[in-house]
Design a protein with these regions (language model features):
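Gram-negative outer-membrane beta-barrel transporters
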Residues: 6, 112-115, 120-123, 144-238
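Outer-membrane beta-barrel translocator domains and adjoining extracellular loop/strand segments
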Residues: 22-31, 74-81, 127-135, 175, ...
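Conserved C-terminal beta-signal and adjacent last beta-strands/turns
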Residues: 45, 49-52, 63, 91-100, ...
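Residue-level signal for pocket-adjacent positions within structured domains
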Residues: 64, 69, 85, 119, ...
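Transmembrane beta-strands of outer-membrane beta-barrel pores
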Residues: 16-22, 65-71, 78-80, 106, ...
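Extracellular loop and loop/strand-boundary signature of outer-membrane beta-barrel proteins
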Residues: 28-38, 82-90, 139-145, 153-155, ...
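Signature of Gram-negative outer-membrane beta-barrel scaffolds
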Residues: 1-56, 71, 176, 184
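Membrane-embedded beta-barrel scaffold of Gram-negative outer-membrane proteins
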Residues: 52-56, 60-66, 92-152, 173
């Protein structure tokens, strides 16, 4: 790490990736069937650099580059024996990642303000793409290496605080991930019909907002009452390639908006804590993984005691 002055610094790093995976995968003519023991080992090297520059005390600029490797996960390699069919010969994703961001942090009396914005560029080879297939009336997820994929995006964050009793903030993310493989296969020479299309089955626009209140020394010194609200938004996105088929009959993962409320009370500087939470306040239909719907409106309570000094 190089730190020639308080205004800027530069870091250079290297990473060695070494992975060995062994497990059971389902293999048959349709990728669902008998269990077979398989294994795979991967060894590679990555590197990168990151720099920071301060414009005065309030503004910070950041720039980074990384030659990165993403190893296939256990589920991507071996499936889960139910809704996910593994692919034991998946290759790691190899990508060139560039990130540029700027932030502003200012405290004016009891008021605090933090703003950050950034842009992202990622050029990925052997992108691990998740597909959906149906065989004999049974649907399952599967994985393939897709060649070249390009991601461009941006994110914005904003947070405001007043003294020690109120804060609110939020983030907005937009990631445009597109197929950049021009040919269907290197040997065929045929143009790929999906070239330039958005990669399906991936959220590309989402945001969250939260608000929190704190009442210190309520009812007794060292006791604090907290109340919080947060909201998550996710834009709808296509389940399959969006330029294929009739637009009126295409399957899309619907837009999702969820609200959560929380109430907590800590006693004697946090030795005793009581909390209550309502998740998915408006009882919306929310989805996580393929074929897995999240719970509707739910209530939780928790009591915690800290036995340390």
């Amino acid at each position: 790490r190089l730190m020639p002055s308080e205004k800027w610094n530069l870091s250079v790093f290297g990473k060695h990736y070494n992975s060995y995976s062994e497990g059971t995968v389902q293999l048959s003519d349709n990728n669902v069937g008998s269990d077979t023991r398989v294994s795979q080992s991967v060894s590679s090297f990555g590197y990168g650099a990151a720099g920071t520059y301060f414009l005065g005390k309030a503004i910070q600029l950041k720039l980074s580059y990384e030659k990165a490797l993403r190893m296939p996960s256990t589920q991507e390699l071996f499936g889960d024996g139910d809704l996910e069919a593994g692919k034991a010969d998946l290759k790691p994703e190899r990508s060139d990642n560039v990130n540029l961001s700027a932030s502003y942090n200012k405290q004016l009396g009891k008021h605090g303000l933090y703003v950050e914005g950034g842009v992202i560029y990622r050029n990925t080879q052997d992108y691990i793409k998740r597909d959906l297939s149906t065989v004999g009336g049974t649907s399952y997820g599967s994985y393939t290496n897709h060649g070249r994929v390009e991601t461009k995006g941006f994110n914005v964050s904003l947070r405001y605080s007043y003294s020690n009793w109120f804060n609110m903030g939020g983030t907005f993310n937009n990631l445009d991930t597109r197929d950049k493989e021009k040919k269907r296969a290197a040997s065929s020479g045929q143009n790929a019909l999906t070239y330039g299309q958005r990669i399906p089955n991936i959220p590309y626009q989402y945001a969250n907002v939260d608000m929190n209140f704190y009442w210190h020394n309520l009812f007794a010194k060292g006791n604090t009452l907290t109340f919080g609200w947060d909201c998550f938004y996710q834009h709808d996105f296509p389940l399959y390639w969006e330029n294929f088929g009739d637009p009126s009959t295409k399957i899309r993962v619907p837009q999702q908006i969820s609200h959560n409320l929380s109430l907590g009370y800590s006693i004697r500087n946090g030795r005793y804590n009581i909390s209550f939470e309502c998740r998915n306040l408006t009882d919306e239909k929310l989805y996580d993984n393929f074929s897995l719907q999240k719970a509707g409106r739910a209530f939780y309570g928790k009591f915690r005691v800290y036995f340390g000094k």
